[in-house]
Amino acid sequence: NSGNPCCDPVTCQPRRGEHCVSGKCCRNCKFLRAGTVCKRAVGDDMDDYCTGISSDCPRNPYKD
């Protein structure tokens, strides 16, 4: 993905000094801060939050 500024064009891994290439918890090649909402609640659901150590948006563990 040579069009992604976070991605090394040869390996498509994060460039040196960058944390991530893509994901709901990745912005400007860095992980979003822990506690940042990455998925808003719908209905009786609860918000999902970034962990600060991953680009993934984990499911809230307190959901039923």
Swiss-Prot record:
Domain Disintegrin: from-to ranges: 1-64
Summary of the tissues where the protein is detected: Expressed by the venom gland.
Signal peptide from the UniProt entry: none
Gene Ontology terms for molecular function: toxin activity
Location in or out of the cell: Secreted
Top-level taxon of the source organism: Eukaryota
Note: Negative results: does not inhibit alpha-1/beta-1 (ITGA1/ITGB1), alpha-2/beta-1 (ITGA2/ITGB1) and alpha-6/beta-1 (ITGA6/ITGB1).
Subunit structure: Heterodimer with VLO5B; disulfide-linked.
UniProt name for this protein: Disintegrin VLO5A
Organism: Macrovipera lebetina obtusa
